Structures are given as structure tokens and as C-alpha cells.
Amino acid sequence: MKIAILSRNSKLYSTRRLIEAGRKRGHTVRILDPLRCYMRIAADGFSLHYKGKPITGFDAVIPRIGASVTRYGTAVLRQLEFMGTYTPNPSDAILRARDKLRAHQLLAAQGIDMPVTVFGDNPDDTQDLLSMLGPPPHVVKLNEGAQGAGVILTEKASASRSVVEALRGLYANFIVQEFIGEAEGADLRCFVVGDRVVAAMRRQAAEGDFRSNLHLGGTAVVADATELEREVAVRSARALGLAVAGVDLIRSKRGPLVLEVNSTPGLEGVEGVCGVDVAGAIVQHLEQSVRRSAD
């Protein structure tokens, strides 16, 4: 099988592991920097060039598209899709996942529980908007933030109003959510591949922080995800159209709540903590999917 990986940096851990896993299983693997890809779109067909040469014959593509190049990266991925290349995470699914508001709407429509979320635009409605959410603390999130960036905890109603008004002044898109205190700064990262959770870890925020992201100083241990948590994780990925996803849950009094569905989850943390060959599971999923489409 001929596999392309859309990535701007071949030295990143996740990219290197996917290369290793693909070649170990006997496949040809090539890295394509999405920003060096350019395309021809016409009624008579689609074509893609990379550094002066046509790109053809790929059976599958694994998108590792950074948030800063989402629009161009997904356009390149969409071109490959139109050229008949299989991808576990289609371009439209990545765009759904990276828009937090849209993702939460889609999850809620499937009956998947999450922290109560509000969204509004007019400054005159701020007080009523926050009253729909309930008393503070509140969590304010940039709509397209990543890796814990653009996430603010406000402990008083006045602070919530001030942050909301400041973000509106910057023309930033954001959502506001209820704060789940019983989670105590911990969440569960479930790594979904296909129709199963292949690994799960419990992440704990650093002292004085409420964000559990590892690159912000959080710690992680192997987690024994319950059957319900695994089911919610798989349903969440499926609701957005993703076959490979990192689904972040928190354990609450009313059960597991989905915080986010990440369409480009890093492999270093989960493989290091859980000792699971996640990259190999992704390549195996590609093999099975391409084989099914050929039958």
C-alpha cells in the first residue's frame, strides 16, 4: 500500500511513528508538506502537484494538519479525497472538530452529554447569556483554540462578563461552559481508532491550573476507561465523522462529559504512558479500510 502523511514536519514524534509503523508493515510511506502541494480543479478531473511533480497513486492519506494551516491543509486533503484516496479523517470531519461550537452542536444532537455550553454575539445579551449557563465558575474557550490555549476560568460573574466583553472587543469567536468542579482538574483522553478505544490515559492538571494538557505541565497515567466511557468516546468520534480521534472526557456526577474531540491527536503522550502501539493500530485500520473499499 502507498501511504501519504500530510505533515509540515517529518521530525515530529507522531509523524515519525506513523512512518515507522507503515514501513514496518511493508508499506511505502511519503511525507507531504501540505503547504508545498498545489492543485488543479476542473470538470475533467482533479490533480495535485508537489514540488514540481504530480502526486498520484496513493491508496491512503493520514492527515496531520496543524491548526495554523487548517484551511489550506483541508483543501489539499479534499483534493486527495476527490482523487480517490482513502483517509480516516476526511476534510469535512476535521473542520467540524476544529469548530468547537459546531462540534458541540453535533454531539448534542446525538444525545452525547457535555458541559452545558452557551454562545452569543450581542453585548446587550451578555448578562442573560450567562444566566442561561448558571452561576460561576465558568470556562471561556476560544472557538478554534488548541492544546489548552485560549481557555480561561472565571470564578465570579463580573469576571465572566469582563472576559466575554474583552473577547468581543477583539472580534474573537468563543463559547462559555459550566465548570465541572468534581473533575478536580483531571480528564480522560480516549484514543479512538475505527470502532474502538485502543488506549486511554487519565491526565491531571498541574498544581494551580485546571487545564490537564500535558504540554502545560499536566501529568498522566494509564486509565481503565469504563465500558460507558469507551462507548461515549467512539460515538463522539463517529458523530463528527472521524475514524482516528482523541476524545477528552471528564468524569462527573451525571456521568462522562465530552470536552473535546481532537482530529489530530498527538501520539507521544499516549504511547509513552500506555505502552500501546497506537501508530500501528492506525496503519492497520488503513489496511482494513482500503481492503474493504476494494472488495
Curated annotation (Swiss-Prot):
Residues the record lists as binding Mn(2+) 1:
D248, E260
Q: What class of enzyme is it?
A: ligase
Q: Which GO terms describe its molecular function?
A: ATP binding; metal ion binding; ribosomal S6-glutamic acid ligase activity
Output the Gene Ontology cellular-component terms. Answer: cytoplasm
Q: Which InterPro entries match?
A: ATP-grasp, ATP-grasp_RimK-type, ATP_grasp_subdomain_1, RimK, Rimk_N, Rp_bS6_RimK/Lys_biosynth_LsyX
Q: Where does ATP bind?
A: K141, E178, F179, D187, R211, S212, N213
Identify this protein by name. Probable alpha-L-glutamate ligase
Q: Which family does it belong to?
A: Belongs to the RimK family.
> Highest lineage ranks of the organism?
Bacteria, Pseudomonadati, Pseudomonadota, Gammaproteobacteria, Lysobacterales
In this chain the ATP-grasp domain maps to 104-287
**Entry's cofactor comment:** Binds 2 magnesium or manganese ions per subunit.
Which residues are Mg(2+) 1-binding? Answer: D248, E260
Keywords (alphabetical) are: ATP-binding, Ligase, Magnesium, Manganese, Metal-binding, Nucleotide-binding, Protein biosynthesis
The cofactors it requires, by name, are: Mg(2+); Mn(2+)
| One Pfam family hit | RimK
- Please give the biological process terms from Gene Ontology that the record holds: protein modification process; SOS response; translation
| EC number, UniProt record | 6.3.2.-
Matching PROSITE patterns, A to Z? ATP_GRASP
Sites binding Mg(2+) 2 sit at E260, N262
Positions contributing to Mn(2+) 2 binding? E260, N262
Instruction: Name the species this protein comes from.
Output: Xanthomonas oryzae pv. oryzae (strain KACC10331 / KXO85)
